[in-house]
From Swiss-Prot:
Domain notes: The N-terminal domain interacts with the head of the 30S subunit; the C-terminal domain interacts with the body and contacts protein S4. The interaction surface between S4 and S5 is involved in control of translational fidelity.
Annotated InterPro entries: Ribosomal_Su5_D2-typ_SF (IPR020568), Ribosomal_uS5 (IPR000851), Ribosomal_uS5_bac-type (IPR005712), Ribosomal_uS5_C (IPR005324), Ribosomal_uS5_N (IPR013810), Ribosomal_uS5_N_CS (IPR018192), Ribsml_uS5_D2-typ_fold_subgr (IPR014721)
Protein name: Small ribosomal subunit protein uS5
Any Pfam family hit: Ribosomal_S5_C
PANTHER family from the UniProt entry: MITOCHONDRIAL RIBOSOMAL PROTEIN S5
GO molecular function: rRNA binding; structural constituent of ribosome
Family (UniProt): Belongs to the universal ribosomal protein uS5 family.
Disulfide bridge map: none
GO CC term (a single one): small ribosomal subunit
């Protein structure tokens, strides 16, 4: 999933204090000739609240086992997100499936203006001041992936100056 982004820094979970947030648990049913077989799927976001975040999906016949599998999956997908203080560096849009997410920087003290799955991802990253708008599909899995799409497109001012071969001052003042 992350190969289409050039500047994605994959992170190993060892040595990080990761906190996990449960985004959703869904009860699923498989109908067989012997009756119904119930199972659960869980979506979890893990992060160190300092720019490192990952998401995972776990499935099992037991809720706690599904959550544990999701946490393990999330730890395999950790990425580093560039932050601007405790907000996002610039406005960015992300898409996945039918879900679209817009993230906009906010001034200090604004808080996380986001709902559901988007809020879980942003708080796990360590973003404290951001405005967001979620449109289209409200499926938690697609919304989480759309939020990751937006976050992975973010670039810090330093990265932009290096890529363009200009000074950091010129990036800010034009």
């Amino acid at each position: 999933m992350y190969h289409k982004y050039k500047n994605v820094e994959l992170v190993k979970p060892s040595g990080l204090e990761l906190k996990d947030r449960l985004v959703s648990v869904n009860r699923v049913t498989k109908v067989t000739k012997g009756g119904r077989a119930f199972g659960f799927s869980a979506i979890v976001v893990v992060g160190d609240e300092n720019g490192v975040v990952g998401h995972g999906l776990g499935k099992s016949k037991d809720v706690s086992e599904a959550i544990a599998k999701a946490v393990e999956d999330a730890k395999k997908n950790l990425v580093k997100i560039p932050l601007s203080g405790k907000s996002v560096p610039h406005e960015q849009k992300g898409k996945f499936g039918g879900a679209r997410v817009n993230l906009m920087p906010a001034s200090h003290g604004t808080g996380v203006i986001a709902g559901g799955a988007v809020r879980s991802v942003l708080e796990s990253v360590g973003i404290h001041d951001v405005l967001s708008k979620s449109q289209g599909s409200s499926n938690p899995h697609n919304v989480v992936k759309a939020t990751f799409d937006a976050l992975l497109q973010m670039r810090s001012a330093y990265t932009v100056s290096r890529q363009r071969g200009i000074s950091l001052e010129k990036v800010f003042k034009g």
